[in-house]
Amino acid sequence: MAVFLLDKPLFLHILTQLRDIKTDQIMFRKGMVRLGRLIGYEIANHLDFDIVKVVTPLGVEAKGVVIKDLDNIMIVNVLRAATPLVEGLLKAFPAAKQGVVAASRREMESSSPPTEMEVEITYMKIPKISKNDIAIIADPMIATASTMMRILGMVSQLQPKRIIIASVIASEYGITKIRNKYPDVDIFTVSIDPEINNRGYIVPGLGDAGDRSFG
């Protein structure tokens, strides 16, 4: 398992806007879309490719690159929070198939940060994939990773060639939890935040990504 921390200035500039309580719903959603596109480009940079030769309009041969798996991508949208993130990912992978999972966690305040949250999955529709496909699971926030672990269990049964998680913020605990059970899964995230509060939210985080995107 590899964790790709996307802490370049442009990523962090957008993330700063998303963290800011003063950022309104429209700008928050636009920021999520922008990050989705940028994360998609970073994922594409880590896909297999071939070196090829093409002939330019000047009749000259030029060396080029063809990324192998751009037509073998399936993106899983964890509703509803991931929808703007997926919109951006689809700009990077316009030929991608898309699956959806409607998942919600039961939130309650406890005396200490929870290590597990009760997750209800009310709907799932994932297209048929082959062993040549790459599954990208999009979820902007990975706190206790309870939702992600449920979805990883379902997607891994489909036996794609590779599973990638696209997130904006992940907790240290959530990454460790995923790594222990799914060591072959790669995670792309903009920030790794240190804490989870008593309600299961990442701290400092950015609040509830679904509520901030859609109200």
UniProtKB/Swiss-Prot annotation:
Keywords: Allosteric enzyme, Glycosyltransferase, GTP-binding, Magnesium, Nucleotide-binding, Transferase. Its EC number is 2.4.2.9. This is Uracil phosphoribosyltransferase. GTP binds at residues 30-34. SUPFAM superfamilies: PRTase-like. It catalyses: UMP + diphosphate = 5-phospho-alpha-D-ribose 1-diphosphate + uracil. GO terms for molecular function: GTP binding; magnesium ion binding; uracil phosphoribosyltransferase activity. Pathway: Pyrimidine metabolism; UMP biosynthesis via salvage pathway; UMP from uracil: step 1/1. The lineage of its organism: Archaea, Thermoproteota, Thermoprotei, Sulfolobales, Sulfolobaceae. Belongs to the UPRTase family. Its cofactor is Mg(2+). It holds the Pfam family UPRTase. It comes from Metallosphaera sedula (strain ATCC 51363 / DSM 5348 / JCM 9185 / NBRC 15509 / TH2). Catalyzes the conversion of uracil and 5-phospho-alpha-D-ribose 1-diphosphate (PRPP) to UMP and diphosphate. Binds 1 Mg(2+) ion per subunit. The magnesium is bound as Mg-PRPP. Uracil binds at residues 202, 207-209. 5-phospho-alpha-D-ribose 1-diphosphate binds at residues 80, 105, 139-147, 208. GO terms for biological process: UMP salvage; uracil salvage. Allosterically activated by GTP.
